[in-house]
Amino acid sequence: MVAYLNIHTAYDLLNSSLKIEDAVRLAVSENVDALAITDTNVLYGFPKFYDACIANNIKPIFGMTIYVTNGLNTVETVVLAKNNDGLKDLYQLSSEIKMNALEHVSFELLKRFSNNMIIIFKKVGDQHRDIVQVFETHNDTYMDHLSISIQGRKHVWIQNVCYQTRQDADTISALAAIRDNTKLDLIHDQEDFGAHFLTEKEINQLDINQEYLTQVDVIAQKCDAELKYHQSLLPQYETPNDESAKKYLWRVLVTQLKKLELNYDVYLERLKYEYKVITNMGFEDYFLIVSDLIHYAKTNDVMVGPGRGSSAGSLVSYLLGITTIDPIKFNLLFERFLNPERVTMPDIDIDFEDTRRERVIQYVQEKYGELHVSGIVTFGHLLARAVARDVGRIMGFDEVTLNEISSLIPHKLGITLDEAYQIDDFKEFVHRNHRHERWFSICKKLEGLPRHTSTHAAGIIINDHPLYEYAPLTKGDTGLLTQWTMTEAERIGLLKIDFLGLRNLSIIHQILTQVKKDLGINIDIEKIPFDDQKVFELLSQGDTTGIFQLESDGVRSVLKKLKPEHFEDIVAVTSLYRPGPMEEIPTYITRRHDPSKVQYLHPHLEPILKNTYGVIIYQEQIMQIASTFANFSYGEADILRRAMSKKNRAVLESERQHFIEGAKQNGYHEDISKQIFDLILKFADYGFPRAHAVSYSKIAYIMSFLKVHYPNYFYANILSNVIGSEKKTAQMIEEAKKQGITILPPNINESHWFYKPSQEGIYLSIGTIKGVGYQSVKVIVDERYQNGKFKDFFDFARRIPKRVKTRKLLEALILVGAFDAFGKTRSTLLQAIDQVLDGDLNIEQDGFLFDILTPKQMYEDKEELPDALISQYEKEYLGFYVSQHPVDKKFVAKQYLTIFKLSNAQNYKPILVQFDKVKQIRTKNGQNMAFVTLNDGIETLDGVIFPNQFKKYEELLSHNDLFIVSGKFDHRKQQRQLIINEIQTLATFEEQKLAFAKQIIIRNKSQIDMFEEMIKATKENANDVVLSFYDETIKQMTTLGYINQKDSMFNNFIQSFNPSDIRLI
């Protein structure tokens, strides 16, 4: 046997560039019979290594490289598992090293795990004799061919392998530079470290002692460990009174079924079927474990989602409280979740509110033990964009060049360097000089290597034994992790449950808590009506900002066209709005509004597709069609659905014949059977799990219900979840204002870090103020809670510590209106800052010296700041306007000019706006144009100014002013935009309107008498304007006479009316 006993794979992170598949490929080409994986301190690569070796008839040997110390000296050591007990010892030894961040292993620790291992000390010198002698009674201790001779110790040839060929030596230098954040030595980076995969010819040229080579085979023969997959490693659930899990589960299910007011016989029949499948598969403990942790969450104030994935198709899950979706009511299939004809572990993923997810994980750790619960490792890789920058950095490329590299590689998921090389600009960069070609060569060699570890976002492993008995562990940022990925851990047989954090559940929970506290209303989301017409009106208007699954522009557009009337409409929309099935949306909407257009390929499809108007939307429908037509069991139907989605030609052909034959036996003609099969094949890729759609649509409906009935609370909590994002905050503030909600400035006696809902509106978060950090807010709020509300500005200044009470903080709070409630103008408070900063207001507050030593604070009353300045400061410190937006305020004053808002404007009507953003670009023809963002004080809208108009108005756009724009509304990427045709300043527009108006319409005649002399019965010259009165009570217009525009009193006449009572046409 020829073997390599010291292979370092790429999972020896940033120490080796040798991919597992390349090591095995080389072994095959060189007729190597066995390979030992010996990464330093870790066992990350074991499963992939084992699979690759077995697939290529290579004997896998499991090992690890460690550094053993006696406290004075350290020796590199390779340990190999002789058997499966030795493999378990490797798991535990690696776990000890990684969990405790050990750089070196004491010989005492190694001795604990050495009985079933082969130990090979490397490069042993005189200084290492003491370490080697410790293991003199260990029969399988060796020294490598470079070690000194020690009596009684055998030598073995062992070659360290870290890269493929001599030409790949530069990868080790590059990886070391990336790891250590240093620069690559371009002169010595190709130095051969003698750590490549030696060919048979190269080995023969080394003149190795034959006895050393013989020992290689001896060691390889001794190693017979193997990974065991699909073990039954489910933990056992502790039942009361040691009752069997099966009996306990049945008793709980029947008890719960009797509590529910359901059709007992129908539900009992389904329950018996599911229970039989679950227990026959041996999964009763699984359901009890999941039920227990969800019960803990719900009884400890942690909101849990209604369900996720296919688990909502299980009645057992519903009765155990794992889901809140009745699978019979919603026509969900158990086999989509757990297929009796395809035995796999159930996969129940659970959504918890994201702010309290850790509480449930902590419960599981306490219940099962710290070493029995862990997260799961994931790996970050040196993908194209990452490796390009990393290698560029270590080669000393400047930031400009690094940015050029980033810009040349497309932002495409999974893009490779080979794909980027097909782009002419990237190819030109590579061949610009020899240095760039060298860079590209190194990048290509490193591309795809694992770079670092991180934690899987949701997966938690649970066992009733210490996990290191089945898999090695490591330490992550938040606790223990398996060293193997999610699929590898599951394949071993370990129980994995996804604990997902869902922000929307946190929002719902906060709303419910605040409504109960403030209004005394206890909202039970399981009892709200799911046919609330106000909810469907909201959805039909597309007012779904902030609503789970429904807030994208595309979905809002679909909702407006569909006009949902039932919960099923929401389920359909969330399932259809995805790549693929989106093309069926127009058909679905048309048929939904006109059911007469629904057509079925065969009448027996109608019961299955009636609710979706003849469109196949759900995976469950595919299974039902296979069952109805071909007499498939639902288990067989699920296998058919999976085969269709994987597009395996051979399997599909077999399933096609199976389907047609079954349909024939069921009485269907072969032609219709083929058509039905092709129909479901077409939709197999598109089909969405209905159970998941129902579960997530329930969350969407609940949020819609809360938005309709408790809007202040809804928006306050949505806003609290976007603190820190000025753009999202401004968007949500704008949306709330459009819904008629009053946005109140931060209030020093009411506001917190989060937004606070009230009957009057929503108090802004103090945390939204630029320059006011979380710790400052915490000090202010804590002081308020402990010692009561602040009485005035001076009281606030006296009670807040100096370290917080800076001029910057005080100015920010004043200028956004946080002290407005004290009845002093903002300018007055700004004047008072010097007093509170110059005087020592932190003298012993409760002592009698305070009144004596503290000078009397007096306000020097000042007139309020101009409105424009107030608005300017609010925008500066908050990113948006709290007081009336300048455009909105001006609109009220100038509405007599017959101007419009963005929301109600039509093509080419004058709209009053402010330009929030102007982005100038150059067209392919070299002409300038611009994309702009318009703001009317309530709404923002994108606009485009094409070259001809841009040339005309470019100078005007440089002014910070209010403008009247007009143009044509259009849609771009499903978003409404304005193609701007004309731009004027408001002042110019007003001047022209007053000069050239053709008609004046009033709806209040109370001012007429004052200007009786101006009004003439007939038109006498070209400057005369028609004066009309519109009577709103009878909806009728009458002519009152004419007024001359040149009359000196003309402007006085116009201004005498309330702007809402007069219009110039």
UniProtKB/Swiss-Prot annotation:
GO terms for biological process: DNA replication. SMART domains: POLIIIAc. Belongs to the DNA polymerase type-C family. DnaE subfamily. GO terms for molecular function: 3'-5' exonuclease activity; DNA-directed DNA polymerase activity; nucleic acid binding. DNA polymerase III contains a core (composed of alpha, epsilon and theta chains) that associates with a tau subunit. This core dimerizes to form the PolIII' complex. PolIII' associates with the gamma complex (composed of gamma, delta, delta', psi and chi chains) and with the beta chain to form the complete DNA polymerase III complex. DNA polymerase III is a complex, multichain enzyme responsible for most of the replicative synthesis in bacteria. This DNA polymerase also exhibits 3' to 5' exonuclease activity. The alpha chain is the DNA polymerase. It is an enzyme of class 2 (transferase). It is found in: Cytoplasm. This is DNA polymerase III subunit alpha. The keyword Transferase applies. Its EC number is 2.7.7.7. It holds the Pfam family PHP. GO terms for cellular component: cytoplasm. Signal peptide: none annotated. InterPro entries: DNA_pol3_alpha_NTPase_dom, DNA_pol3_alpha_thumb_dom, DNA_pol3_finger, DnaE2/DnaE/PolC, DNAPol_HHH, NA-bd_OB_tRNA, PHP_dom, Pol/His_phosphatase_N. It catalyses: DNA(n) + a 2'-deoxyribonucleoside 5'-triphosphate = DNA(n+1) + diphosphate. Keywords: Cytoplasm, DNA replication, DNA-directed DNA polymerase, Nucleotidyltransferase, Transferase.
